[in-house]
Amino acid sequence: MAQPNYSGIIKFIFTPITSLTTIYIFFSEEYAWRGFLQNIFFDKFGKKLGVIILGMCWSLWHLPLIFTLYTPEAPILGIILRSIHIVGISIFLGYLYIKTKNIWFCAIIHVLNNSAFLITNSKESTITYHDILIVSMVVLIFYVPFLFTKEYKNNLE
């Protein structure tokens, strides 16, 4: 007699639980970085420098993931690549939070960002200097211009 296959039922039960847990994790991270720390960094360093330093700190926060999950095969290049990207996305998420005061928008963009990196990142690939150049160009073209919006006008003046 064949054993019943419960995999569909298990996926049906655990997918919503996993999704809720994932959303909670991203919401919590954005609540801490954008909702709490961003204003502290803005008050201490001004908005432009504050968001860059916040992005650097956020990059340090991700070091364990960079070493173990994202790029264990090329840790130094991985740190450079991911740090550039994390500072860039931090600029955009900071802008988004200033404009909307909505942590949920930041959490959703964070989820989409991480999903895009997981989809494009293959275990068989090794990070190269070319990858760093491409990510740096994307950050310069798409994220850095947000530093020059009125929302990032320096509040230390």
What residue ranges belong to the model's regions?
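Membrane-embedded alpha-helical segments that form the functional core of polytopic membrane enzymes
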Residues: 12-24
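Aromatic-anchored segments of alpha-helical transmembrane domains
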Residues: 23, 56-65, 111-121
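Membrane-helix interface segments
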Residues: 46-50, 75-79, 99-104, 127-129
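Membrane-interface helix/loop boundary segments of multi-pass membrane proteins
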Residues: 27-55, 69, 98-102
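Residue-level hotspots within the lipid-embedded alpha helices of multi-pass solute transporters
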Residues: 22-27, 59, 82-86
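C-terminal membrane module of polytopic membrane proteins
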Residues: 101, 109-157
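Hydrophobic alpha-helical transmembrane segments
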Residues: 16, 48-53, 80-84, 104-108, ...
